[in-house]
Design a protein with these regions (language model features):
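N-terminal cap/lid segment of alpha/beta-hydrolase-fold proteins
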Residues: 2-43
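Short beta-strand element of the alpha/beta-hydrolase
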Residues: 44-53
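Alpha/beta-hydrolase active-site loop
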Residues: 60, 67, 90-112
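Conserved alpha/beta-hydrolase
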Residues: 68-85
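Residue in the alpha/beta-hydrolase core beta-strand immediately N-terminal to the catalytic nucleophile
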Residues: 79, 116-118, 142-144
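Alpha/beta-hydrolase fold nucleophile elbow
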Residues: 111-123
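Glycine-rich nucleophile elbow surrounding the catalytic serine of serine-hydrolase chemistry
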Residues: 121-131
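Hydrolase active-site cap/lid region
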Residues: 134-178
Length: 178
């Protein structure tokens, strides 16, 4: 179903107001795939590299891409490790290398201002934005942590009940008594 939806999305993209370029970069015998949209009338725009969470694919981020474009920035939408077309598992301890491949790619494109690069991760993808804010601090100017897990979200004492009884149920029972 996912591959069918990607095919339909790319067919629909031919009719988008802002052209969408499918980017494929070689990566460890496979490829990383992203969607680039450029703002109208801006030369050498800054770039926002953005992605969703575990169940949010690059095809789901059109609304965010359109907001980025409104501010005169280029939108480069990708999948986080473990989702969509990203070939690397999110459990791979070195999964961050996919982001570094994208950061390197941006510098190969002369139409971007590679000195003004930001990242934006949503949901579980926010974890990667926060991590890049530290590990790529010399390469990026800003990072958006949009609705990501904090504190309990990474602790076994919370995760086990959340995955066995449902996060909302466990939270409601333990915090609010219902």
């Amino acid at each position: 179903a996912y591959h069918h939806s990607v095919r339909i999305f790319r067919k629909a993209a031919q009719h988008f107001e802002t052209p969408l370029e499918v980017i494929e970069i070689p990566f460890e015998g496979s490829k990383l795939i992203g969607y680039l949209q450029m703002p109208t009338g801006v030369s050498k725009p800054p770039v926002v590299l953005h992605w969703g969470g575990v169940d949010g694919w690059k095809e789901d981020r059109l609304r965010i891409a359109s907001e980025i474009l409104k501010f005169g920035m280029a939108s480069l939408t990708i999948d986080m490790p473990g989702s969509g077309e990203n070939p690397v598992s999110f459990s791979d301890p070195a999964a961050e290398r996919t982001y570094f491949a994208w950061l390197d790619y941006v510098l190969t494109r002369s139409e971007f201002d590679g000195t003004r690069l930001g990242v934006w991760g949503g949901s579980f993808g926010a974890y990667w934005a926060a991590r890049l804010a530290h590990t790529a601090k010399d390469r990026i100017k800003g990072a958006v942590f949009h609705g990501g897990n904090v504190h309990y979200g990474f602790q076994r004492d919370w995760l086990v009940p959340a995955f066995t009884t449902g996060g909302a149920t466990w939270t409601s029972e333990s915090r609010f008594g219902y």
